[in-house]
């Protein structure tokens, strides 16, 4: 049986931490949907289309990864995609409590949806898109946190 997993998130922007998780998920599962949430309530820096385009660019080397946007309840999206595995990255213990709640809510709507938690590589465990945006906003060097095309797109958005 082929396995199909979803790695969902806002990914505003995709960081090396996200790439670490999706690359490892691609090694574990037959097909991985790198699912980018619209997340308009989070007021993202990049539009959904921009995030999809950038994610496709930096994951093009992963043959079994498909980048797709979505704007619906995760369980409904998973059913439509015929996926029963949800990949989530955990950076810290504080992430776990929220992810545990999400996993249980998803299971309420789709009992067969399994959440698989991956820890990022240790050198990437402190990264977050929000933190990187803040560093860039204050003229910090973001080149070690983001792939070059994404770093350039962010600097352009910030007028730098």
From Swiss-Prot:
Q: Which Pfam families match?
A: CTP_transf_like (PF01467)
Q: Where is the protein situated, by its record's location annotation? A: Cytoplasm
Database matches in InterPro entries: Cyt_trans-like, PPAT, Rossmann-like_a/b/a_fold
Recorded superkingdom: Bacteria
Q: Which pathway is recorded for this entry? A: Cofactor biosynthesis; coenzyme A biosynthesis; CoA from (R)-pantothenate: step 4/5
Binding of substrate: at which residues?
10, 42, 74, 88
Q: Name one GO biological process term.
A: coenzyme A biosynthetic process
Q: Which residues form the signal peptide?
A: none
Q: Which cofactor does it need?
A: Mg(2+)
Gene Ontology molecular-function annotations: ATP binding; pantetheine-phosphate adenylyltransferase activity
Which GO terms of the cellular component aspect does the record hold? cytoplasm
Q: What does this protein do?
A: Reversibly transfers an adenylyl group from ATP to 4'-phosphopantetheine, yielding dephospho-CoA (dPCoA) and pyrophosphate.
Oligomeric state and interaction partners are given as: Homohexamer.
| Name of protein | Phosphopantetheine adenylyltransferase
